[in-house]
Amino acid sequence: SNKANLKDALMLCESLNLEHKTIEIQPILDAFLSACESVCKTRMGNLSARIRMSLLYDYSALKGYLVVGTSNKSERMLGYGTIYGDLACAFNPIGELHKSDIFEFARYLGVPQCFVDKAPSADLYEGQSDEKELGFKYAEIDELLKALKRVDTQKIARADKNLLEMVEKRIKTNAFKNSMPLIFKDI
C-alpha cells in the first residue's frame, strides 16, 4: 500500500478504536511473481487482491470473524473487481449502493472529509486510481448506470458516447463476475 494511504487507514482505525493488523504482502507477491511469466499490471493487481483476501479470510478464521465486503454497485456492475480478491466476502452491506452514494453515506456518517475527498483506489500499485483506469468520474458513471437501470432513454441518449461504450462493454464483458460459479448436477 501507498504509505500515505496506510497512515490514513491506521489513523481511522485508531480514531474508531478498531482492532487492526498490518501484514506486508510484498514477500508473498514476489514469491508468486517469480513463478510467473511476464506479468502485466492487471495480473499483478489481481494477484495482490487475492493475496490480501486470502490473508483476510485466514485471519477471520483465526479470530472467528466474518469478512465484510467493500465493493459497491458501480464496481460490481462494471466488473471492476477481482474474483476471489476484493469481491470476496461473507456479506456486503454496501453492495447495492453506487460509488457516488457511498460518498454521500460517508458524509452522513461523519467520516472525516479527507477520506471522502480521497481518489478511489484499490491501491494495488503506485499511482493507481479507479477513475484514471476507467477514464471517467464516478459521478458520470453512476448517473449513466442509474439511467440504464431505469431505462431512461433520454439520459442514455445524452450520455457521452465514449462513456456509454465503456459502460456497456464492461457490463457485458464482466457479467460473469456477478454470478456464483456454475455447478453441473445430474448431467
Listing of model-derived features with the role each one plays in the protein:
Residues 1-77:
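ATP-dependent adenylation/nucleotidyltransferase module used to activate substrates
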Residues 14, 44-52, 66-140:
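Catalytic subdomain that performs nucleotidyl-dependent activation
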Residues 28-31, 118, 166, 170:
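Short acidic/histidine-centered micro-motifs embedded in hydrophobic/aromatic stretches
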